[in-house]
Amino acid sequence: MSDQLFERTMAFAGILQAVAQVQYIARHGDSDKDALAASLQSVLVTNPETTSDVYADKVALRKGYELIVSQLGDAKQKDVEVTRYLVGILALERKLTRSSNAMGMLSERINQIHRQLSHFEITDEQVIANFAGIYSDIISELGPKLQISGNPEFLKRTQTQQKIRALLLSAMRSAVLWRQLGGKRRHLVFARKTIVDTAMKSLTL
C-alpha cells in the first residue's frame, strides 16, 4: 500500500476513534483515559512531519481501524449512529477549512492550550473544558449542531458534555488532516475495499 493511502487511512481511523469515544461516553458517562488523551493530543500536533506524529498512541487507533472494517466492509450490521456522526463531522470540516477566520481563531485557541499544559495534564477538567470551548465557540457556529444520542442522565452532566465536545474537536482535526492527505467523500463509496484492506493491514503492524 502507498504511504499516502496508509496515512490517509490512519487519519480516517482517527476520526472514527474519536467518534467511538463520543458514542461510548454518551451511553455510559465515562471514558478510557488513555484513549481520551490520545485523541486530544492529536489536536495539538499542528505541524507534523508525518501523519504518525499526530497519532503517537497506535494502540488507541485500533478502535478506529476496526470501525473502518465494520462500517465500510461487508458486515451486515452497520452502526447508523457512527455513520451519522461521521457525515456531520465531514460536513463541518468543509465549512471550517473554507473559513480563514475560523481557522485563524482555531490556531490561536490551540496555542492557548499548549501554554496551559505547562501547568495541567491534557485530561484535567480545565483543559478538557478549553477543548470543549473551542468546539462550541468556533466549530458549532459553522453549521447545524450534531445531535448526540445517549443516556439523558449522563448527557445532562457538564463533564460529559465537555468531553463529548472535546472529542468532536479531535474528530474534526482528523477530518481536516484526512482531507489534506487527499481524502474525499466519494472514496468512501468507490474505494471502500481499498480503504478496508489498508485498515486491516494497519491492524497487523
Swiss-Prot record:
UniProt cross-references to InterPro entries, sorted A to Z: HflD, HflD-like_sf
Family annotation (Gene3D superfamilies): HflD-like (1.10.3890.10)
Protein localization: Cytoplasm; Cell inner membrane
Superkingdom per UniProt: Bacteria
Membrane topology type: Peripheral membrane protein
Keywords: Cell inner membrane, Cell membrane, Cytoplasm, Membrane
Main location group: cytoplasm
GO cellular component: cytoplasm; plasma membrane
Keyword Cell membrane: yes
Family: Belongs to the HflD family.
NCBIfam families: PRK00218.1-2, PRK00218.1-4
Name of the molecule in the record: High frequency lysogenization protein HflD homolog
